[in-house]
């Protein structure tokens, strides 16, 4: 499990609700000059994004980076596919894992680390409605227990 470090620019909160995250990977992302300026300004949306392995490379799809305002002719298509940078060993492992039924790669966070944009992608399996209700119920029970403990320890 890789933990995101650095300045978090965007998060995909819906991914943790809709998917069970089994493993996470930190990947670099290939961006143009105006795209990185938009990312630094936190003008990126991960909500509908997903990644896939094609020809031994990982590609990020449906991630919207708003065009940079001062970029005029240098701006790219906001919804274009972008290449993710991972080690060959990681790509091979992901390719094998994705062949399983119901598995997908979803972007969880975009953050800046040492001046470079990084994407935290998660190997995920879709949740059913009853799984979502169960996780909400578990979270509520944990909150109640913490509230009770805090109230008890406060006396």
UniProtKB/Swiss-Prot annotation:
<dbReference type="InterPro" id="IPR023620">
    <property type="entry name" value="SmpB"/>
</dbReference>
<dbReference type="GO" id="GO:0070929">
    <property type="term" value="P:trans-translation"/>
</dbReference>
<protein>
    <recommendedName>
        <fullName>SsrA-binding protein</fullName>
    </recommendedName>
</protein>
<feature type="compositionally biased region" description="Basic and acidic residues">
    <location>
        <begin position="132"/>
        <end position="147"/>
    </location>
</feature>
<dbReference type="GO" id="GO:0003723">
    <property type="term" value="F:RNA binding"/>
</dbReference>
<dbReference type="InterPro" id="IPR000037">
    <property type="entry name" value="SsrA-bd_prot"/>
</dbReference>
<keyword id="KW-0694">RNA-binding</keyword>
<feature type="region of interest" description="Disordered">
    <location>
        <begin position="132"/>
        <end position="155"/>
    </location>
</feature>
<keyword id="KW-0963">Cytoplasm</keyword>
<dbReference type="Pfam" id="PF01668">
    <property type="entry name" value="SmpB"/>
</dbReference>
<dbReference type="InterPro" id="IPR020081">
    <property type="entry name" value="SsrA-bd_prot_CS"/>
</dbReference>
<dbReference type="GO" id="GO:0005829">
    <property type="term" value="C:cytosol"/>
</dbReference>
<comment type="similarity">
    <text>Belongs to the SmpB family.</text>
</comment>
<comment type="function">
    <text>Required for rescue of stalled ribosomes mediated by trans-translation. Binds to transfer-messenger RNA (tmRNA), required for stable association of tmRNA with ribosomes. tmRNA and SmpB together mimic tRNA shape, replacing the anticodon stem-loop with SmpB. tmRNA is encoded by the ssrA gene; the 2 termini fold to resemble tRNA(Ala) and it encodes a 'tag peptide', a short internal open reading frame. During trans-translation Ala-aminoacylated tmRNA acts like a tRNA, entering the A-site of stalled ribosomes, displacing the stalled mRNA.</text>
</comment>
């Amino acid at each position: 499990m890789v933990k995101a470090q650095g300045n978090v620019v965007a998060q995909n909160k819906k991914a943790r609700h809709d998917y069970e995250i089994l493993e996470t990977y930190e990947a670099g992302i290939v961006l143009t000059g105006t795209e990185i300026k938009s990312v630094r300004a936190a003008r990126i949306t991960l909500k509908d994004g997903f990644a896939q392995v094609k020809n031994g490379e990982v590609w990020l799809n449906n991630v919207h980076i708003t065009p940079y305002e001062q970029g005029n002719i240098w701006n790219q298509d906001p919804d274009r596919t972008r290449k993710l940078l991972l080690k060959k060993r990681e790509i091979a492992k992901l390719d094998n894992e994705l062949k399983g039924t119901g598995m997908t790669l979803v972007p969880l966070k975009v953050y800046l680390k040492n001046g470079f944009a990084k994407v935290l992608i998660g190997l995920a399996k879709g949740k059913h409605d009853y799984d979502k209700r169960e996780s909400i119920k578990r979270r509520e029970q944990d909150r109640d227990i913490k509230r009770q403990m805090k109230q008890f320890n406060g006396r």
